[in-house]
């Protein structure tokens, strides 16, 4: 009996111990995982309305971080744009590539617009905005690859513009991914707080999405235009320079210098040195001299492209008459072309010819001014001063552009649009044979090129102060001078005849002043004007007239 009671007591003791082990142990709230606590709270609270602010993806920490990054990119691109804008006025180391134009500014603006579009109503993602962003980044990636593989374009764009293309490409891709991540965060919040993904859109959201997609379409169109212009420029590289690209200014950039005939040997005839006009390249202007060369009347001649014109690279600011003339003198020294020279200058090229002659008097045989500019045209208001008659600047239309503030403002606007290449691309699309590579590089479409417009802007910035003072100090007295003027310009403009008369009196040895009849500003385009122009040049260089 004693044994039985002992066993019974042991069993009851074991039962009590096992029941104590099976009982739940109290758990502190701090020991429960945060996700489980949050899930429990969500189960206890009622589902929220989809429009409730608490459903916003910005309540998620990772989305708020993306918002901070996107906002930071706006300021980064804004600072980049300001630096690139300042580099158009001042030479900043590292920001002066050989083919410097307005492309860098446009790329910075595109990147800024992409970031602004993303930041505008950040919490409202748009699917088609994201798709367009992927297409934009793909186009820019193709641009980068093409520009990198085509050697002349790679050298022209330099590290700066190539980096900007890559930067905008990455910006577009990253902002599209931001839109995807925000949408994922939005769905996550909706499932957690409303129980389902909300597919309906409010009117305000639809309006926001519409403008976001519209903004992305505009960005894509801009990038497409830039891409097409870049691809056409790559195609145009098959058109080789006529002469040599000579490095100048400590090898910072190159100017195009092309000579025909024996310019290093001895001859009784001087080297005819050609200066083009404001909107006319030396290649286009020299055709009447080329004709004389083929007829063995002009033995040798040289043409060159000022920075930004034709085949030449862009120059760092500033670009005054004297500074550009120094580039020409350096190129001639490097090519060991010593003269003597007969300088022919058309339009504003007459001022460059005058500057070159004044700095190389011992090497100058003669100067021919072809409907040349007066220094007054370098001033903001060319009709100021004694003996000048006030007239509208519209009288210069289709002949030249004055250096006033309105023209300067228009040039800058044209500059910002120029990387899109709308008109040249349209010309190429409609008339590919008529508007060929030659037309874009040094022909009629040259005036739409971004580097040309930038050169004009640089020329305009210092024209009224630096260039004007330089040309007024230029002395060509006692040099043999010939002047030919358009009768059309003299009859049309109140001051043109007086300006041409003043040019004819720059030297005591002015041999002739010829009025080309039935000729507009571009004298060589009319048969009679071309004949008079050629005969005058032949007389200046000591040759017999060959046309009767």
Annotated model-derived regions:
Residues 245, 250-262:
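A short loop-to-beta-strand scaffold at the N-terminal edge of the catalytic core in hydrolase folds
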Residues 338-381:
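Conserved hydrolase catalytic core segment
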Residues 128-194:
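Membrane-embedded alpha-helical segments of integral membrane proteins
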């Amino acid at each position: 009996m004693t044994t039985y009671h002992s066993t019974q007591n042991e069993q009851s003791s074991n039962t009590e111990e096992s029941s104590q082990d099976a009982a739940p142990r109290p758990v502190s709230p701090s020991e429960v995982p945060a996700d489980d606590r949050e899930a429990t709270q969500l189960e206890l609270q009622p589902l929220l309305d989809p429009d409730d602010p608490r459903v916003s993806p910005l309540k998620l920490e990772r989305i708020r971080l993306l918002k901070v990054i996107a906002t930071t990119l706006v300021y980064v691109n804004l600072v980049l744009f300001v630096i690139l804008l300042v580099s158009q006025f001042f030479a900043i180391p590292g920001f002066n590539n050989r083919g410097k134009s307005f492309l860098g500014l446009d790329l910075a603006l595109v990147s800024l617009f992409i970031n602004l579009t993303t930041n505008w109503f950040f919490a409202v993602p748009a699917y088609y905005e994201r798709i367009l962003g992927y297409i934009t980044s793909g186009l820019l990636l193709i641009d980068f690859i093409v520009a990198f593989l085509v050697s002349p374009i790679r050298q022209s764009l330099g590290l700066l513009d190539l980096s900007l293309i890559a930067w905008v490409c990455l910006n577009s891709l990253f902002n599209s991914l931001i839109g995807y991540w925000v949408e994922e965060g939005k769905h996550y919040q909706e499932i957690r707080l409303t129980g389902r993904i909300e597919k309906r859109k409010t009117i305000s959201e639809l309006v926001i999405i519409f403008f976001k997609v519209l903004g992305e379409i505009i960005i894509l169109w801009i990038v497409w235009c830039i891409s097409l212009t870049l691809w056409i420029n790559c195609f145009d590289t098959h058109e080789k320079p006529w002469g040599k690209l000579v490095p100048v200014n400590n090898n910072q950039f190159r100017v195009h210098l092309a000579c025909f005939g024996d310019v290093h040997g001895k001859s009784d005839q001087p080297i005819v040195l050609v200066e083009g006009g404001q909107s006319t390249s030396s290649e286009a202007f020299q055709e009447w001299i080329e004709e004389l060369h083929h007829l063995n009347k002009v033995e040798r001649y040289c043409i060159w492209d000022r920075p930004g014109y034709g085949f030449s690279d862009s120059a760092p600011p500033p670009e005054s008459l004297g500074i550009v003339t120094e580039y020409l003198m350096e190129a001639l020294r490097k090519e060991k072309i010593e003269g003597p020279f007969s300088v022919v200058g058309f339009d504003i090229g007459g001022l460059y010819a005058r500057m070159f002659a004044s700095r190389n008097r011992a090497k100058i045989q003669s100067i021919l001014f072809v409907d040349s500019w007066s220094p007054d045209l370098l001033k903001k208001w060319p009709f100021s001063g004694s003996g000048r008659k006030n007239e509208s600047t519209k009288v210069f239309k289709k002949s030249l552009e004055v250096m006033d503030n309105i023209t300067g403002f228009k040039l800058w606007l044209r500059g910002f649009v120029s990387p899109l290449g709308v008109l040249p691309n349209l010309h190429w699309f409609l008339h590919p044979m008529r508007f060929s590579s030659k037309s874009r590089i040094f022909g009629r479409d040259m005036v739409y090129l971004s580097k040309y417009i930038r050169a004009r802007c640089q020329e305009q910035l210092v024209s009224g102060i630096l260039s004007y003072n330089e040309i007024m100090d230029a002395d060509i007295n006692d040099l043999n001078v010939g002047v030919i003027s358009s009768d059309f310009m003299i009859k049309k403009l109140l001051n043109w005849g007086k300006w041409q008369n003043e040019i004819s009196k720059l030297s005591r040895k002015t041999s002739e002043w010829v009025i080309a009849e039935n000729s507009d500003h571009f004298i060589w385009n009319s048969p009679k004007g071309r004949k008079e122009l050629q005969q005058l040049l032949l007389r200046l260089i000591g040759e017999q007239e060959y046309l009767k």
